[in-house]
């Protein structure tokens, strides 16, 4: 193993000098271990990743944790390989950092556990699956209007407190319960408190045993935040490639991945591009996104929470992400204020899969008719606010009448929210969802009260609820 010495420390960037002919490759992991000799020194166990070659004998590296206590002259060891993290069953139910070290105070990962490098090429063309297959989530509004594709990439937009986390938990729960699938959650540059809450909520709702979690939070150096998404993806790829699973991969938040890359780029002395972002923005995003795909054996479907800086959708970071997305799920605060959960905006959410060739003619027609009805209702709201319902034509009154029932029927109770609502969660198969909305559009349930449609699963539950309300069904 080649040994070198620290010659310069600039915050999270460390320059290391090696002997001639022993220069480590780009992306290699280097280790610095140092025992404190007195009270003034600190114990150091630091991993660096090679980013640049400077001349014949020096490398510039990015630190994966704090560089406190590092001094020039300290010994550095080249591991001869990129950062490698544990994969397989040992990762389920556990929480890791960017290096694949457990941070949940649980037992150590066995030394003989398989480890994979976090840097690897995307699957080859001949390995990719060309079939477009829908991933059934059991969540009506998603399955009907913006369906997810196996191996696809979904953008999850929403401000604070509109239900992103609950939606993520329900997806993890439904994939585990209905499909027996595995989920991997990568917390990239978000609040430590949120990660802690998510871990405990998952423990309480019982989905943690089907989930591996990786965190590189806001307080960590940019190197860790930039690589933690790759750590999570490597764990997800193992379940896809070796076990043939359909894996759900969550990234919260993909913007922080770009932000960390921008910080690293500036520290490495690269010339910034538009809005101060790194010149390699599209390449870095592509290297991550191209690995998220369906192969002949399994799939990795990713759901990426996207923070939009200053609500500017033309900002290079979100704009680069959009180019890779197959579907978007937009959460709307107005809907959550109305008590409609999940607060998914049925008109703003989109999916490439909503076409007759993929979902079938009936599903497509019902979905489009639902959107048309809701759009017309939205247009009529101003008139209703100023003149009242009485001024509408009979036809428009019927549209409003049905649109309100559709709006409420797009809500449902979640399994993971049972402890708060006291109501059992519901998983609705796509066929049942399409049938329910088709019958509402046909006017079959015009006589039932609006409240009967709120927070229920299948259409049969609406009839049952109306019966309990004393309505003649």
From Swiss-Prot:
It is a peripheral membrane protein. Keywords: ATP synthesis, ATP-binding, Cell membrane, CF(1), Hydrogen ion transport, Ion transport, Membrane, Nucleotide-binding, Translocase, Transport. Transmembrane segments: none annotated. CDD domains: ATP-synt_F1_beta_C (cd18110), ATP-synt_F1_beta_N (cd18115), F1-ATPase_beta_CD (cd01133). One of its GO terms (molecular function) is ATP hydrolysis activity. Its main location: membrane. InterPro entries: AAA+_ATPase, ATP-synt_VA_C, ATP_synth_F1_bsu, ATPase_a/bsu_AS, ATPase_alpha/beta_chains, ATPase_F1/V1/A1_a/bsu_N, ATPase_F1/V1/A1_a/bsu_N_sf, ATPase_F1/V1/A1_a/bsu_nucl-bd. Its EC number is 7.1.2.2. It comes from the Bacteria. It is found in: Cell membrane. It holds the Pfam family ATP-synt_ab_N. GO terms for cellular component: plasma membrane; proton-transporting ATP synthase complex. ATP binds at residues 158-165. It catalyses: ATP + H2O + 4 H(+)(in) = ADP + phosphate + 5 H(+)(out). Belongs to the ATPase alpha/beta chains family. Produces ATP from ADP in the presence of a proton gradient across the membrane. The catalytic sites are hosted primarily by the beta subunits. F-type ATPases have 2 components, CF(1) - the catalytic core - and CF(0) - the membrane proton channel. CF(1) has five subunits: alpha(3), beta(3), gamma(1), delta(1), epsilon(1). CF(0) has three main subunits: a(1), b(2) and c(9-12). The alpha and beta chains form an alternating ring which encloses part of the gamma chain. CF(1) is attached to CF(0) by a central stalk formed by the gamma and epsilon chains, while a peripheral stalk is formed by the delta and b chains. This is ATP synthase subunit beta. The lineage of its organism: Bacteria, Bacillati, Bacillota, Bacilli, Bacillales. The gene is atpD.
């Amino acid at each position: 193993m080649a040994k070198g010495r620290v010659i310069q420390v600039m915050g999270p960037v460390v320059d290391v000098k090696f002997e001639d002919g022993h220069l480590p490759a780009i992306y290699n992991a280097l280790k610095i271990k140092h025992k404190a000799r007195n009270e003034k020194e600190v114990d150091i166990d630091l991993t660096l990743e090679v980013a640049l070659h400077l001349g014949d004998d020096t490398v510039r590296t990015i630190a994966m944790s704090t560089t406190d206590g590092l001094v020039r002259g300290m010994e550095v060891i080249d591991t001869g390989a990129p950062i490698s993290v544990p994969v397989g069953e040992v990762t389920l139910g556990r929480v890791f950092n960017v290096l694949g070290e457990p941070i949940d105070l649980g037992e150590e990962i066995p030394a003989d556990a398989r480890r994979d490098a976090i840097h690897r090429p995307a699957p080859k063309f001949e390995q990719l699956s060309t079939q477009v297959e829908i991933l059934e989530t059991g969540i009506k509004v998603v399955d009907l209007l913006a369906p997810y594709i196996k191996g696809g990439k979904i953008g999850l937009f929403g401000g604070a407190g509109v239900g992103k986390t609950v939606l993520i938990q329900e997806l993890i729960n439904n994939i585990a319960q209905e499909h027996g699938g595995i989920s991997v959650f990568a917390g990239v540059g978000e609040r430590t408190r949120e990660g802690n809450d998510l871990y405990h909520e998952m423990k309480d709702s019982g989905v943690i045993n089907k989930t591996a979690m990786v965190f590189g939070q806001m307080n960590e150096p940019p190197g860790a935040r930039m690589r933690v998404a790759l750590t999570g993806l490597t764990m997800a790829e193992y379940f896809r490639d070796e076990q043939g699973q359909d894996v759900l991969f969550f990234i919260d938040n993909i913007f922080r991945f770009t932000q960390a890359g921008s910080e690293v780029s500036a520290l490495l002395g690269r010339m910034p591009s538009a809005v101060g972002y790194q010149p390699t923005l599209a390449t870095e995003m592509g290297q991550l996104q191209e690995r998220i795909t369906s192969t002949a054996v399994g799939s990795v479907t990713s759901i990426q929470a996207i923070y939009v800086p200053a609500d500017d959708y033309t900002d290079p970071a979100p704009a680069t992400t959009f180019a890779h997305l197959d579907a978007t799920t937009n959460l709307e605060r107005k809907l959550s204020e109305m008590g409609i959960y999940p607060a998914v905006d049925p008109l703003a959410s989109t999916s490439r899969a909503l076409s007759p060739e993929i979902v079938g003619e009936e599903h497509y027609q019902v979905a489009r008719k639902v959107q048309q009805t809701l759009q017309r209702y939205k247009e009529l709201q101003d008139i209703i606010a100023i003149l009242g319902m009485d001024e509408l034509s009979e036809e428009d009154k019927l549209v409003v009448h049905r649109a309100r029932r559709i709006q409420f029927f797009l809500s449902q109770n979640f399994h993971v929210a049972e402890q708060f609502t006291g109501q059992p969660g519901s998983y609705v198969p796509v066929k049942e969802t399409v049938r329910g909305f088709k019958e509402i559009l046909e006017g079959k349930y015009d006589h039932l009260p609006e409240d009967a449609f709120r927070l229920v699963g299948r259409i049969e539950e609406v009839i049952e609820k109306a019966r309990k309300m004393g309505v003649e069904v």
